[in-house]
Amino acid sequence: LNTEFQGGADFKESCFSDALFDNAEFTGIALFISTKFSGLSLFRKSLFHTEASFEESEFQSDVIFTSARFNGPTSFDRSIFNGTTTFKGTSHQSSTSFEFSKFHRVTDFSITSDISKSDKND
């Protein structure tokens, strides 16, 4: 909680029982590639200054990104969400991708995109 990760944060292929990253600030690239989250995952009000990648990760319980801010490209491609997933009030300054991801429970995607239509890739 309330932690700042200066430079890059590399959690590739890690395992978390409960991931408590509330109010965390990632000043460099945040890599959670192929990471398993077995318990509650909290990223409320977290700030990702640059790229964030959660590709091929598995969230076995609830994951909450309420009011998180993503300033760089973000990927959840090929991830599995087994619990309730909440992205309520998140802000995205760049592209966010959930390509080939699977959601098995109720999902709240009240996302605010700050990308103009001309910047989006269709």
Locate predicted features.
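N-terminal leader/targeting and pre-domain segments
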Residues: 1-122
